[in-house]
Amino acid sequence: MFNMNVDESASGALGSSAIPVHPTPASVRLFEILQGKYAYVQGQTIYANLRNPGVFSRQVFTHLFKRAISHCTYDDVLHDWNKFEACIQKRWPSDDSCASRFRESTFESWSTTMKLTVRDLLTTNIYRVLHSRSVLSYERYVDWICATGMVPAVKKPITQELHSKIKSLRDRCVCRELGHERTIRSIGTELYEATREIIESLNSTFIPQFTEVTIEYLPRSDEYVAYYCGRRIRLHVLFPPAIFAGTVTFDSPVQRLYQNIFMCYRTLEHAKICQLLNTAPLKAIVGHGGRDMYKDILAHLEQNSQRKDPKKELLNLLVKLSENKTISGVTDVVEEFITDASNNLVDRNRLFGQPGETAAQGLKKKVSNTVVKCLTDQINEQFDQINGLEKERELYLKKIRSMESQLQASLGPGGNNPAASAPAAVAAEAASVDILTGSTASAIEKLFNSPSASLGARVSGHNESILNSFVSQYIPPSREMTKDLTELWESELFNTFKLTPVVDNQGQRLYVRYSSDTISILLGPFTYLVAELSPVELVTDVYATLGIVEIIDELYRSSRLAIYIEDLGRKYCPASATGGDHGIRQAPSARGDAEPDHAKSKPARDPPPGAGS
């Protein structure tokens, strides 16, 4: 699963004292927790907001828009305005060219067109950058930070395909179809340069998956090293872990939540097992009893004894006596037994003519005095022997089942050699049924086939009777633990990254947004350390939640281009005539002598300070 192939030179550099940091069973589980494998609760959904790259996209958009629109001079804007005004004067009669409403309309048309053109140029090309596929992944960066506090980064060269895309981007940014407007050309050229830098930076750095990196700690040099595909790569240790006695404890949110997450997960697993075991609700306690044991003895004697077996006859007598609850019934049974037995005896008194009691009377007396006691002792002995045999039988059956389970586990699925079937056994284990997510029938079958658990449901067997029955539906409560884990996730993420919740009028949280501290803690290292975008300014928390259209309006309103256009408007279309006409152009002579002195007193058209910058 993990790509840990380090070349010989690299492994020699590690030395025998290197402590493995990742991948280890503990570190891998941290990433699996982020992927929702263990006890995914509602509070973990905040993490989805945290790793959303929307804030970074707004930061790139703000940087490109602000840098491009600020790369214009007052001379370029003035040149474009003069060119536009000259075209308007050619199209309209000269008598109307100096009318106040006409001047306002002309300037408003030009300023609005300039704004739309610049906005169209910038947004179209910036969107292509934001929505194009880049190698650098902000989501993986957040995963590494939240799991380990360290971020590996791989430098890679720019591909030829990317060079071709950058070249085509230059043609779109220069905007040849817009004519010879200096302002647009300056903005487009600067947009291309800024975009090229962003694209090259985002595609020259790669953050690998957690399954592709090996991280180790070197105690001798007190440094962490990372390897990717056999070669050493950069490793940004933002939050160093604690290492004690060879055990690594990361300084990360998921590491702090680890124990609580697995406590909740094991409780859910326990609840699922109880649910499966209690699918059949009727349970019974089964024990040994001798109430109907005589039937088994009679069946045994019937199969193994002779046709006329005295033990069988006497046992039948005892059975009949036990089934009769009245004195008359017992008397009838004894009389019947004596009659049957006396027919097979020789009456010596009748044969030799001796007086005294008859044979039937003597037999009756004998039965009443001694036979019953002897037979009872013998039957008790038989019962003890049968009970011992039954217990011995159950013991051997358990041993046979255990041996069969061990033999089946040691052999392969098809009964093959363990060495030959090792890959198949590993594959079967990997594809085993998950108790939490598997089907109920498969999970029950897995539980009852487990050799380590004596779980089963059976009907009472020989010499067993139901002593008590009850309904068992116990399932461990897990809702409270899940709720506590949700609150713990929220508290950890909010306090670690200083997130700001956004709530509605009812106080329900809609989503979370980046605060200024979040941008400094999370977005700052990604921008300057990982992506190496040193010219990019960190976005403010206000822009982090605004829409793109709102960001465009704010950036344009405070841009250099908007200030220059506003200054031209004040001079060309003054608010009142008392303040003097600070128009850019001289009033046409066709107006007559209505304002000769005023026209002559116009100031020189000097650009404002910093106009050439």
Swiss-Prot record:
The keyword Nucleotidyltransferase does not apply. Forms a portal in the viral capsid through which viral DNA is translocated during DNA packaging. Assembles as a dodecamer at a single fivefold axe of the T=16 icosahedric capsid. Binds to the molecular motor that translocates the viral DNA, termed terminase. Signal peptide: none annotated. Belongs to the herpesviridae portal protein family. GO terms for biological process: chromosome organization. Pfam families: Herpes_UL6. It comes from the Viruses. Coiled coil: none annotated. Residues 592-605 have a biased composition (Basic and acidic residues). Residues 577-613 are annotated as: Disordered. Its main location: virion. It comes from Epstein-Barr virus (strain GD1) (HHV-4). Keywords: Host nucleus, Viral genome packaging, Viral release from host cell, Virion. This is Portal protein. The keyword Chloroplast does not apply. Homododecamerizes. Interacts with terminase subunits TRM1 and TRM3. It is found in: Virion; Host nucleus. GO terms for cellular component: host cell nucleus; virion component.
